[in-house]
Amino acid sequence: MTIHIYNTLTRQKEEFIPLEENKVKMYVCGPTVYNYIHIGNARPPMVFDTVRRYLEYKGYDVQYVSNFTDVDDKLIKAANELGEDVPTIADRFVEAYFEDVTALGCKHATVHPRVTENMDIIIEFIQELVNKGYAYESEGDVYFRTKEFEGYGKLSHQPIADLRHGARIEVGEKKQDPLDFALWKAAKEGEIFWESPWGQGRPGWHIECSAMARKYLGDTIDIHAGGQDLAFPHHENEIAQSEALTGKTFARYWMHNGYININNEKMSKSLGNFILVHDIIKQYDPQLIRFFMLSVHYRHPINFSEELLQSTNNGLERIKTAYGNLKHRMESSTDLTDHNEKWLADLEKFQTAFEEAMNDDFNTANAITELYNVANHANQYLLEEHTSTVVIQAYVKQLETLFDILGLELAQEELLDEEIEALIQKRIEARKNRDFALSDQIRDDLKDRNIILEDTAQGTRWKRG
C-alpha cells in the first residue's frame, strides 16, 4: 500500500515518493515565541507529529525540522510592553511551547533551530540573492525582487497580475514594487539588531525558514508543512527565495492544515476568541484534546465546542474501557477455544483498514473509526464463554500500536480500593438524598473503570470486572 498526499502545489493527491529511499526530509513552520500558544497554534504540531509517526511506523527515517522565530515585530512589541529584553521573552515562551506540545503527545523535532542562532546563514542567503540580482538594498533594508522570479504565485494559484493589483507599499517602505517583500529590515532606534553588509538590522520572517530548511535539510526537501494561513504569503515567498537561489525545487509536497473555529469564526489572537493550550489542559486531559483534533481530517476546519469535546471524550473512554477489560481478562483467560483464527483474521482486517485510511492523505478521522471497530469487536469477543490469551494479547497489542501511531496513550490509572469505597459512600449519600441522577452517574463512571457494583440487602458490594 502506497501513501498518497494532497499537495497544495498541484491541488491533487499524489503518490508519496521521497527523494531518498526510506528517508524523509520534513520541515514544519514553528511558532513565533512571544506568547503562549492557543489550540489553533497547536493543531500543526499535533497533525504533523502524527504524519511523522506514521511515516516512521512505515519504516522511514524522518528528519523533522521545526523552527522557532525568536526575533520579530511581535517579540519586540512584547519586550517594550513588559520592560524585558527579547531573548528573555523568547526563552520563556520556547519553554512554555515545549511544555504544551509535550503534554499534547508531540515528540521533539530532530532539530528545533532558532533564528537568532542561525543569523550567519540567513545573512549569507540574503547576500547570495543580492549577488544574483534577485534582491536589492534600499536605505538599509533589503527586498526580494519578485518580478524576477517567474513562478511567483504558483503555490497559492494566484496570477501575479492579480496579486500586484491587491498589493500596496506601506508608509516607510522603500521597495520598488508592491509585491516585493523584506529580506532584511534596518534597525529602528532601541531595537535589537545584528551587524550585516547593509548595516544594523534583523531578518524578515520569510527568509528565516528558507535559510534554516536549506541548512538542516538541503536544497530540496520532501515535505513542507504548516497552517493554511501560511500558504500565502509565507510559503509562497519561501519558494521564491529558495528556488531563485538554488534553481531547484524547494519542496516536493506542500501540506496545510485547516483552521480551528470558535462559533464558526477562525480562532486568532487578533480576534480575541482564542483558548490557550496551557489553560485548557488544566481542564481537560491533553490526550482528549489530541484525540479530538485527530477526529477530523487535517485539511478540514474544526469547530471547537465543549459539547463536541465531551462527545469525543465518551468515545475515547469506550475504547479505553475495552482496553482495560482486555487487560483484566488476560489473567483469567484459557486457551480452550478453537476459534482463534477467525478473531485474529478480523483483527488483521481492522489493521489493514487503519493503514488504508492513513495512506489516504493521513485520514486520521477514518483511522479512528477503526479504533472504535477494534474496541467493539473486543467487547464482542469478551462475551465468549471461553477466551484465549493469544487473541486477547493480539487485541491489546493492536490497540497499543494504533494509539502509538496517533501519539495517544491507553494506560488508565487503576482506582485504589479506598477511592472506590469513597465513591460508593458518596453514592449511598446521593441515594439517601434521592439524588438518583448523581447515584446513577457514579455507578456508570465506576462501570467505565471496570468496577461492578451490586446492591444487596447487606449493602453495596463491588468487584473488578
Swiss-Prot record:
Assigned keywords, A-Z: Aminoacyl-tRNA synthetase, ATP-binding, Cytoplasm, Ligase, Metal-binding, Nucleotide-binding, Phosphoprotein, Protein biosynthesis, Zinc
Cofactor: Zn(2+)
EC number: 6.1.1.16
Location within or outside the cell: Cytoplasm
Motif mapping: 'KMSKS' region: 266-270
UniProt motif ('HIGH' region) ranges: 31-41
Keyword presence, Zinc: yes
Residues holding Zn(2+): 29, 209, 234, 238
GO CC annotations on file: cytosol
Domain of life: Bacteria
Predominant location: cytoplasm
Enzyme class: ligase
Gene3D superfamilies named in the record: Cysteine-tRNA ligase, C-terminal anti-codon recognition domain, HUPs
Cofactor note: Binds 1 zinc ion per subunit.
Residues binding ATP, per UniProt: 269
Family the UniProt entry places it in: Belongs to the class-I aminoacyl-tRNA synthetase family.
Name the record gives this protein: Cysteine--tRNA ligase
